[in-house]
Amino acid sequence: ANRAQEIARLNGIYDGLMRNAGVLRLQGHGRLIDGQTVEVTDAAGRATRHRARHILIATGATPHVPDIEGRELVVSSDDMFDLPAFPQRLVVVGGGYIGCEMASIFRGLGAQVTLLYRGEQILRGFDDEVRQFAADEMRKHGVDVRVRCDVARITPGAGDTRHVVLADGGTLEADVVLYATGRRAHVDGLGLREAGVAQAADGSIVVDERFATSLPGVYALGDVVGRLELTPVALAEAMALVDH
């Protein structure tokens, strides 16, 4: 309840900032028609078209869970703060910063946490010394960090528990299995292909050094372009685009 209240408070602040800046907010689903037109469909199904000289796409990304047996038994990072009960035993699959954050948070709250990562070391893409230090500190604080460890499948356990079957034949039992195995650009239904906006193989929007897409007049930034998916990075990109 406190989390929901805080989110509502922050949303109210952002709404006020936009109103004071003269921003008109349209509630609905947006679809790109061309380089200067967006169609917005509201909850009642009414569609209106709006034109602008420049269009910015900043729809973010959503958690990606690989297509493994038992994927319906796992949760994503978006679900972790809406769990019906605190997990006494948590298995985190994925060694990126989101997985490491979640593992550390729930260990700090008292959960027994195991983090599984199929690579050689957690936090791929970060400085090697930082990666080793983070792994050592997590282990020091009680997180069971296992590298070169892959999951074969997830099966139901007794009650609401889950069995994590590892590729080497080992098993783990958990109350919650969190998959933090990356995020994918949130582009479904935006009409990018029809409008002529180029996308990478993973669905993210292709942009140049000035955040321009392949469609003149349309820009994109933040997680939807598939670069460093961090809030400070998105804010810096937005400021750079505004200055440009």
Q: Locations of the language-model features?
A:
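Structural/interface elements that position substrates and couple domains in central-metabolism enzymes
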Residues: 10-11, 48, 85-87, 98, ...
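Glycine-rich dinucleotide-binding loop and its adjacent helix/turn
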Residues: 57-115, 141, 193-195, 199-214
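Glycine-rich Rossmann-fold phosphate-binding loop(s) that bind the pyrophosphate
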Residues: 93-96, 126, 223
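A Rossmann-like FAD-binding core segment of flavoenzymes
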Residues: 24-27, 31-40, 109-209
